[in-house]
A protein has these predicted regions:
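Short, Lys/Arg-enriched N-terminal segments with co-localized hydrophobic residues
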Residues: 1-3, 17, 21
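Conserved catalytic-core motifs of GNAT/GCN5-like acyltransferases
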Residues: 13, 88-91, 151, 161, ...
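A short beta-loop-alpha structural element at the N-terminal edge
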Residues: 27-41
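Active-site rim helix/loop that mediates acceptor-substrate recognition in acyltransferases
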Residues: 51-77, 81-104
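Conserved acyl-donor/pantetheine-binding loop and adjacent beta-alpha core of acyl/acetyltransferases
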Residues: 83-118, 124, 134, 173-179
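Conserved glycine-rich acetyl-CoA-binding loop
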Residues: 106-108, 120-134, 143, 157-158, ...
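Conserved GNAT acetyl-CoA-binding A-motif
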Residues: 133, 140-152
Length: 187
């Protein structure tokens, strides 16, 4: 009978673990964006980037209209705590005009661009942005893209390399008057 008890205990442990992991996922739901998320998205962006670099509410309205399905939003309860967004294109390099021109999105494009990776300050250093980046990578892979492209500042090159992005050199982008590095993940 001892053997059976052990098995039952194990089953109970698994059940408990399942419930805990479900709660965790429920606690931090990840989903795509609709226009109802506009206020929250713009507020998180404003909290994460200086004005010269932050996308405006009007720009996000356009982005959500054209590629809301290429936003990955993470919530803590009802609160938006982090998001990643970017459109899809056949262009191989990320250019400044892409940020402002959401209509350049091409749903059947080869490359998933990443325009923004934002986590509000109080929720940083928990790996939430990383989870969203992994979601974006996973979705791009499922959708048959060639890969993903992003630009980042010097101190983040190493961070994105951990996800499989390779450094391609200094980007032509002068977004916000800052130097950006282009990184690419190829499938």
């Amino acid at each position: 009978g001892v053997h059976m008890d052990n098995e039952k205990n194990l089953k109970d442990e698994f059940k408990k673990a399942d419930i805990e992991s479900i709660n965790l996922c429920h606690h931090r739901e990840i989903r795509t964006a609709t226009i109802n998320d506009l206020e929250a998205v713009a507020a998180v962006e404003a909290e994460c980037f200086p004005a010269a670099e932050a996308a405006t509410k009007e720009e996000f309205a356009e982005r959500i209209k054209f590629y809301g399905d290429h936003f990955w939003l993470m919530f803590d309860g009802d609160k938006l705590i982090a998001f990643v967004d970017g459109f899809v294109t056949d262009e191989e390099n990320l250019t400044d005009e892409m940020y402002a021109k959401a209509q350049l999105h091409n749903e059947s494009g080869a490359w998933q661009m990443i325009f923004g990776v934002n986590t509000i300050p109080a929720y940083r250093k928990h790996g939430y942005a990383g989870e969203l980046i992994k979601c974006a990578i996973e979705d791009a892979r499922k959708q048959g893209r060639k890969g993903l492209v992003l630009t980042c500042k010097d101190h983040l090159v190493h961070y994105y390399a951990k996800f499989g992005f390779e450094y391609e050199g200094v980007s032509e982008s002068e977004h916000g008057g800052v130097k950006w590095n282009q990184m690419r993940l190829k499938f």
